[in-house]
Curated annotation (Swiss-Prot):
Cofactor(s) the protein needs: Mn(2+); Mg(2+)
GO CC entries: cytoplasm; ribonuclease H2 complex
EC number: 3.1.26.4
Reactions catalysed, as given in the entry: Endonucleolytic cleavage to 5'-phosphomonoester
Stated family: Belongs to the RNase HII family. RnhC subfamily.
Organism, scientific name: Streptococcus pyogenes serotype M4 (strain MGAS10750)
Function, in words: Endonuclease that specifically degrades the RNA of RNA-DNA hybrids.
GO molecular function: magnesium ion binding; RNA binding; RNA-DNA hybrid ribonuclease activity
Protein name: Ribonuclease HIII
Amino acid sequence: MNTLVLKIDAILSKHLKKQLAPYTINSQNTYVAFAAKKNGVTVLLYKSGKLVLQGNGANALAQELNLPVAKTVFEASNNSQDIPIIGSDEVGNGSYFGGIAVVASFVDPKDHSFLKKLGVDDSKKLSDKTIQQIAPLLEKQIPHQSLLLSPKKYNELVGKSKPYNAISIKVALHNQAIFLLLQKGIQPKQIVIDAFTSQSNYEKHLKKEKSHFPNPLTFQEKAESHYLAVAVSSIIARNLFLDNLDQLGQDLGYQLPSGAGSASDKVASQLLAAYGMSSLEYSAKLHFANTHKAQALLTK
C-alpha cells in the first residue's frame, strides 16, 4: 500500500476540495480540515496544510488531481513510532478450540518507557505465564478496545451459507475494535493492522460492514514485531483468548488445548463421546478439519 505525503498551499487546497467535493467523507480527527475517498484512496487534508493520500492507487490519483507528485514522500515502509499509533491484532483464529480475540490499542510515544520496562514484545515470543502477568497492567494503563467472539457465535456466523468466512469475520472484528476505540475520542496519527490478508481483500470485505471511519490503514506483516501498539494488542488478545479457553474447558470438564493439532483431535473426540456435537458447537470452530478427524477417531 502506498502513502503519499505532500505540503500544499491554500490555493491548491481550495482547488482540491472542489475536485473531491462529490467524494467527501466524515472525519472525527479534529486536525483534519477535509477528507475524501476516491478510487479506493483515502485523502486527508490536515489544517497544517499537510495532505495524505493512502491506498494502492495513491500515485495515480495524485496525477489525476495534478498534485506535485515529485515532491511526495513515500512512507509505505516507514514504521516510525514517534507518533501516536493505534495497533490491532487477533489471537485464536488458528486454534480449533476457543474463540477469536481482537484488540485495538492506542500507544503514545510517552508510553514507550513504561512498555519497554515491562518487556513488551511480540507476544508470540512470550510465555503464557508472562503474558498473564503483563496483560492486566497493559489493560489498566493503555487505552484499548477488546472484542471476543465466542466459538458458539463464531459457528453461527462463519461457514457455508453463512454471512462470513474465516477472513471476512476477522475484517469485521478488526474494523469494529478500531471503530469503537476511535469513538472514545482517540486521535492517532497512524493505524496499523497486523496483516492477515491483502489490502484489496480487506477493503472488499469492509464494504459489507456498517461501521466506517476515514482514517487510512497501514497493513504490516508481523506488525507485532515492529510496532509497540500492535505488540500491546497481541498480548492483551492472547490473555483474553487464554482466559476464554480456560473457561470453556472448566464448563465442559476438559482441558482444551490451543492450536489445531492431534491433541485437539483427541480431546474433540472425547467431547463427542461424552456430550455429542453440541459440545463442539459450544467450544470449537466447526469448519476446521479437526471436527471430521475427531469423528473418525470416535468410530475406531
